[in-house]
Amino acid sequence: MNPAEWIEGYRRAWEERDPEAAAALFTEDASYRSSPFREPPNLGHEGVVAYWTGATSSQEDVQVEMGEPLVDGNHAAVEWWTRMRNEGEEITLVGCLLLRFAPDGRCEDLREYWNFESGLLPPHEGWGSWRRR
């Protein structure tokens, strides 16, 4: 699995709200830090499933867009833009994943930074692409 395939799997797992599919993208001993202030991070498949089960349980109509990843060896960074209903409220979450991959292509370390805004907002022009213009 290469980074682009991993990112597509993550996008699909989120839209389908599938904790098991998400966990399959990670090594058995992975560290998943969904916030820079989360201590301790979610660890391993059990930690990923537990986090995703709680985080996605109130989400509906999830639409995830992933930007163009920046890849350097076994590291990648990618922006994401998500619109959904959460507990009935329309919201937009925008964030970035910092990823380190194991040799088999699964993620062994994820660090996530994100922002929240009310309403269903579209990405701004140029979002998700780091290509020089």
Indicate residue ranges for each PLM-predicted region.
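Short, low-complexity N-terminal intrinsically disordered segments enriched in polar/charged residues
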Residues: 1-28, 128-133
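A beta-strand edge to alpha-helix "cap/lid" segment located at domain peripheries
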Residues: 2, 53-133
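A structural signal for well-ordered alpha-helical scaffolds and beta->alpha junctions
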Residues: 3, 7, 45-48, 92
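Hydrophobic alpha-helical core bundles mediating ligand binding, dimerization, or RNAP-core interactions
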Residues: 7-10, 14, 26, 48, ...
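Hydrophobic pocket/interface hotspot
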Residues: 10, 22-23, 30, 44, ...
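A solvent-exposed, acidic/Ser-Thr-rich amphipathic alpha-helical stretch
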Residues: 16, 20-73
